């Protein structure tokens, strides 16, 4: 779910924090990429004519590998050094959200079957995307492909987003690429959306310190805004959308004060609402020490033999097409990169600061 409505809210009340970038802006930079979200996007968007994911003759899904190979090539062509980060074990507090997602997938599967029986193929195609789940097998296959391509990856202790952010705070990387606004709630100094997506989609960068400055919020106040909007660890309260949440935090500065000022109405709705635990999970998530990750971080040459064995012999990719793609990747890595001037500047301060600027009304 991410943070409900946060992207649109930031565009409206803190537009200076949002920048449109060319991919060349990230030349020579190390970027942590939320791999779990990325694989889901590949499986739901790289599809056959009927809307189902690409698969080999054994029925094994291959869309995630097609997408991952293409993304690695595009990043290499732009001179970007990626670190892919996969989800580890989700916190127990997220089980409710995961159960809701499971139920939603099952409901979508039933609707899809009904649409197919009624001959409504377009509706069935739309519903097929809602039935997708990224499995451990998908992740292991992606990790194996990255191994053959010489690209480093990390399996997080918990949430991939939290691990990415911990790495950004310790300057192991210079930004976090994800579509999920949770990254800002975890405190990432820089969120990059649509990185190397292909097509005409603009890369959007959101700078957290600028968000805080524009809003006149401390990080703690911003985090309370995120929780009040609704997140994976705590659903939003009935009747409170992103704009209302923003106005309440502007006025009261914390969730406790919001509840206390409402003469018991919200407090009643908030009974058993785990906002305190949500704060703890965002501020102190389970992560691997970024300093330990940095010690072993290495980009290696492509192992063409292993890549061909996996993609062509095992996953049934077309041999000629795969050879050409690997040639393209090797050439991209060797070619000197033309970087934009601003790509050489250091990233801004990695820790959100308490700001004292005037609050926007």
UniProtKB/Swiss-Prot annotation:
- Matching Gene3D superfamilies: 5' to 3' exonuclease, C-terminal subdomain, 5'-nuclease
Q: Which residues form the signal peptide?
A: none
Q: What is the documented function of this protein?
A: Structure-specific nuclease with 5'-flap endonuclease and 5'-3' exonuclease activities involved in DNA replication and repair. During DNA replication, cleaves the 5'-overhanging flap structure that is generated by displacement synthesis when DNA polymerase encounters the 5'-end of a downstream Okazaki fragment. It enters the flap from the 5'-end and then tracks to cleave the flap base, leaving a nick for ligation. Also involved in the long patch base excision repair (LP-BER) pathway, by cleaving within the apurinic/apyrimidinic (AP) site-terminated flap.
Single GO BP term: DNA replication, removal of RNA primer
- Start and end residues of each stretch annotated as Disordered: 341-361
Q: What's the chief localization of this chain?
A: nucleus
- Annotated segments matching region N-domain: 1-105
Lineage, uppermost ranks: Eukaryota, Metamonada, Diplomonadida, Hexamitidae, Giardiinae
User: According to the record, how does the cofactor bind?
Assistant: Binds 2 magnesium ions per subunit. They probably participate in the reaction catalyzed by the enzyme. May bind an additional third magnesium ion after substrate binding.
Q: Would I find Glycoprotein among this entry's keywords?
A: no
Q: How does it assemble?
A: Interacts with PCNA. Three molecules of FEN1 bind to one PCNA trimer with each molecule binding to one PCNA monomer. PCNA stimulates the nuclease activity without altering cleavage specificity.
Residues bound to Mg(2+) 2 are: 180, 182, 232
Indicate what this protein is called per its UniProt record: Flap endonuclease 1
What PTMs does it carry?
Answer: Phosphorylated. Phosphorylation upon DNA damage induces relocalization to the nuclear plasma.
């Amino acid at each position: 779910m991410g943070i409900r409505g946060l992207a649109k809210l930031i565009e409206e009340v803190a537009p200076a924090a949002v920048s449109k970038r060319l991919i060349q802006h990230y030349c020579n930079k190390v970027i942590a990429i939320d791999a779990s979200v990325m694989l889901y996007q590949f499986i739901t968007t790289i599809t056959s004519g009927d809307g189902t994911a690409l698969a080999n003759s054994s029925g094994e899904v291959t869309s995630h590998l097609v997408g991952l190979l293409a993304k690695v090539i595009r990043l290499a062509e732009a001179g970007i050094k990626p670190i892919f980060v996969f989800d580890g074990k989700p916190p127990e507090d997220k089980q409710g959200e995961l159960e809701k997602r499971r139920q939603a997938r099952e409901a979508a599967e039933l609707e899809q079957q009904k649409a197919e029986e009624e001959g409504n193929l377009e509706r069935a195609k739309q519903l097929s995307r809602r039935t997708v789940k990224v499995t451990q097998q998908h992740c292991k296959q992606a990790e194996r492909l990255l191994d053959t391509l010489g690209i480093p990856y990390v399996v997080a202790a918990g949430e991939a987003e939290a691990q990415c952010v911990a790495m950004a705070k310790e300057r192991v990387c210079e930004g976090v690429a994800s579509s999920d606004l949770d990254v800002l709630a975890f405190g990432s100094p820089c969120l990059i959306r649509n990185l190397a997506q292909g097509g005409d989609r603009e890369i959007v960068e959101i700078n957290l310190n600028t968000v805080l400055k524009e809003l006149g919020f401390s990080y703690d106040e911003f985090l309370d805004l995120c929780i009040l909007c609704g997140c994976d660890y705590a659903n939003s309260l009935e009747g409170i959308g992103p704009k209302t949440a923003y106005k309440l935090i502007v006025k009261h500065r914390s969730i406790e004060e919001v509840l206390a000022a409402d003469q018991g109405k919200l407090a009643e709705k908030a009974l058993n609402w785990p906002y305190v635990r949500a704060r703890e999970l965002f501020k102190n998530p389970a992560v691997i020490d970024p300093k330990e990750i940095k010690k072993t971080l290495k980009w290696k040459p492509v192992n063409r033999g292993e890549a061909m064995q996996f993609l062509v012999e095992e996953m049934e990719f077309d041999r000629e097409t795969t050879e050409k793609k690997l040639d393209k990747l090797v050439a991209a890595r060797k070619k000197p990169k033309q970087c934009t001037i601003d790509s050489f500047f250091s990233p801004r301060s990695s820790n959100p600061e308490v700001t004292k600027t005037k609050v926007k009304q």
